[in-house]
């Protein structure tokens, strides 16, 4: 049993060390983009067809910053609120070449796994697989600590 645990620990550390070299540093978000919230909302619609070209790094940077970036560097607070300010939501970026975790503090993507996992996160919807990027938002409930107490606080 100890050998298995040691082997797993070595594997985790080697994967972490390998992934540390696989970072995409994002450009600073463009806070001067034109357009209004009302225009964006009025033009919002669903589609089942996606352009085959990749999203450029600047657009991806802006999208990630808007979704969960840090907009108050003095406090580390985000563009999106979170319950009890636990910052429980992580954004994963799934691209044809690999899956990445968005690191808001350093505004970069950290490789989690190489390979195309868009089909795995498509939820059985074949048309989603052709999208050049998928964003997966995951809530890490462990950040609330004592979940019974956190649930009581959240639900009143």
Residue spans for each PLM region:
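Positively charged n-region of N-terminal signal peptides that target proteins for export
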Residues: 1-4
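Hydrophobic h-region of N-terminal signal peptides that target proteins for export
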Residues: 10-19
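N-terminal amphipathic, basic helical "cap/leader" segment at the start of enzyme domains
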Residues: 20-131
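Glycine-rich, acidic and aromatic/proline-enriched surface loops and short helix-turn segments
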Residues: 137-142
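Short acidic/His/Gly/Ser-rich catalytic and metal-binding motifs that mark active-site loops
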Residues: 143-147
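Short pre-catalytic strand/loop immediately N-terminal to key active-site residues, enriched for Gly-Thr
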Residues: 149-156
């Amino acid at each position: 049993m100890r050998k298995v645990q040691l082997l797993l620990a070595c594997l985790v550390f080697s994967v972490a060390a390998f992934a540390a070299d696989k970072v995409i540093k994002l450009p600073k978000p463009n806070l001067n983009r034109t357009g209004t919230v009302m225009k964006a909302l009025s033009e919002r619609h669903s589609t089942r067809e996606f352009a085959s070209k990749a999203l450029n790094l600047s657009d991806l940077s802006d999208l990630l910053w808007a979704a969960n970036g840090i907009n108050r560097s003095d406090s580390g607070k985000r563009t999106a609120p979170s319950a009890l300010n636990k910052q429980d939501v992580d954004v994963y970026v799934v691209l044809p070449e690999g899956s990445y975790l968005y690191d808001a503090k350093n505004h970069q993507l950290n490789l989690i796994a190489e390979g195309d996992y868009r089909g795995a996160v498509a939820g059985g919807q074949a048309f989603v697989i052709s999208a050049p990027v998928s964003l997966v938002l995951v809530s890490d409930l462990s950040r609330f600590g004592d979940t019974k107490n956190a649930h009581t606080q959240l639900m009143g």
